[in-house]
């Protein structure tokens, strides 16, 4: 799920492009199950004909290979995971910090830390290194 980069570990996300039709999600999750790959967080965006399934999984490179072999178009990109306390308003506070730093968030979704049980906001932005630095300097736990 991660890759070492300089002095930290980068969180990896699998993006899968698929037709918006019955059984596709079950097929994707079945492929991952057969490869013994755990889904740690996911969000799906759809349109009338196609969708994008974004996932943080236990082995993104293996998942990508298996899904490509099954005919899916997919790729792996860097994302940021930020652990937050499970309290009302914490997402708003995180987003306000980014807004005040002139950072735009492309999309976000929720996962959770299996060890601590705390929520993890997974999000994508244009400049991951800048955002990581900004959040760490303000006391956030960046994964």
Language model region names:
Residues 6-143:
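A conserved regulatory-domain signal marking ACT and ACT-like small-molecule sensing domains
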């Amino acid at each position: 799920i991660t890759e070492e980069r300089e002095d930290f570990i980068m969180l990896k996300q699998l993006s899968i492009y698929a037709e918006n039709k019955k059984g596709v999600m079950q097929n994707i999750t079945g492929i991952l199950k057969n490869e013994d790959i755990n889904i740690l967080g996911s969000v799906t965006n759809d349109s009338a004909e196609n969708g994008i399934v974004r996932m943080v999984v236990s082995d993104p490179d293996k998942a990508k290979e298996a899904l490509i072999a099954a005919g899916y178009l997919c790729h792996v990109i860097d994302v940021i995971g930020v652990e937050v306390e499970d309290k009302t308003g914490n997402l708003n506070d995180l987003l306000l910090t980014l807004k005040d730093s002139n950072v735009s968030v492309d999309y976000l979704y929720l996962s959770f830390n299996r060890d601590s049980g705390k929520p993890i906001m997974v999000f994508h932005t244009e400049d991951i290194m800048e955002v990581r630095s900004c959040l760490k300097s303000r006391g956030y736990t960046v994964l």
